[in-house]
C-alpha cells in the first residue's frame, strides 16, 4: 500500500530557495561584469566580431 512521504519543512525549503537565488545572483553579476568589459573594450579573453554599416548596403 502506498505511504505518503513526509513534508519538507519550511526551513529546508527556504534554505534551498536561498541557495538557488544566490547561484542566480552570481551568474547575473558575472554576466554584467563581462558585458561591462566588452563595452569598455577592456576584455582580453573574449573575442567577438564587429560589423561596420556601409552606406552602400542600405541603398
UniProtKB/Swiss-Prot annotation:
Record keywords, A-Z: Chloroplast, Plastid, Ribonucleoprotein, Ribosomal protein
**What processes does the entry annotate via GO biological process terms?**
translation
Per UniProt, subcellular location reads as:
Plastid, Chloroplast
Q: Which GO terms describe its cellular component?
A: chloroplast; large ribosomal subunit
- List the molecular function annotations (GO) for this entry: structural constituent of ribosome
* InterPro entries to which the protein is assigned, alphabetical: Ribosomal_bL32 (IPR002677), Ribosomal_bL32_plant/cyanobact (IPR044958), Ribosomal_zn-bd (IPR011332)
**Which Pfam family, any one of them, does this sequence belong to?**
Ribosomal_L32p
Q: Please classify the protein's predominant subcellular localization into one broad category.
A: plastid
Assigned protein family: Belongs to the bacterial ribosomal protein bL32 family.
**Protein's recorded name:** Large ribosomal subunit protein bL32c
- Name the source organism: Physcomitrium patens
Gene from which the chain derives:
rpl32
Amino acid at each position: 500500500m502506498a505511504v505518503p512521504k513526509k513534508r519538507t519543512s519550511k526551513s529546508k525549503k527556504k534554505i534551498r530557495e536561498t541557495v538557488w537565488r544566490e547561484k542566480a545572483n552570481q551568474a547575473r553579476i558575472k554576466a554584467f561584469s563581462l558585458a561591462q568589459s566588452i563595452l569598455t573594450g577592456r576584455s582580453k579573453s573574449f573575442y567577438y566580431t564587429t560589423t561596420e554599416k556601409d552606406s552602400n548596403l542600405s541603398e
